[in-house]
């Protein structure tokens, strides 16, 4: 009942920070000896951590699709980039039904990769580089404004919604962690310019600056911050679909609403929002395929990992890879950390499960069954 009350009475703001290429392998939190994310490692101690979460793909649009639409990756193009990508039942739908404003904030130009079309078509107000006054853009790259500038925009929007007493859900997509790896000087400690290490340290610094700035705001106590990634920095490896190259953080920080804790169960990027909604007691009807991990029976955990061509499905420590021309390969996963695989005979039941999940996502999309209205 306590949990139900968070939603029915308080309607917290939900701020989902999708960090460009924030691989768990950069973080002390996930065992890196010389951490690149000292601030996030520290923040995680006061947060609820889902420590075993995997991205569905290798592209930003896939990550945004997983977080917003909560479906496995469809073969070929991401739904975000397809023509009929509006009017879908996304994570914002149940929130708008109870009076929320939903927004998508992006540090670059949102027409890139069809993001504006997708988010606008699904009821999100767009705030991107074009909404930031030129004089405030003291640093940018070809990809977008420095992350700290994007986070300042988020705070301004949350201030506005607080004044009109409208709860708000934001999906924020950062851009600084891209080549050429340049970022504002003199902010993050020990951050070398032009190197991935430097830019990750800068982004880490800017997220915690954002949260510290938010702490002085009247809406802070009633705001939930979710920090995750769109994908890993590289999914190339010795083996096809190396599972360790898909591991991403999922940190939920809301000191007044959610007790710190940790859940180590295997979890997909498509499960993040359904799980969060479960934590704060939002009950809603959904057409999506993500699980609330806290309500899922043991043994039913499954994840999806994909590239443009290959679709991987992992269940009970076995990986099935479906590739074009109906080729199927099956592996036993001996080690998630190093992607240690042993090839095994195909398991017809597991193959069927994989095919069913992937075909269902395509079927629902193609037949307009992911739409909000029948």
Language-model segments: what does each one mean?
Residues 1-288, 297-308:
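Soluble catalytic regions of membrane-associated enzymes that act on cell-envelope
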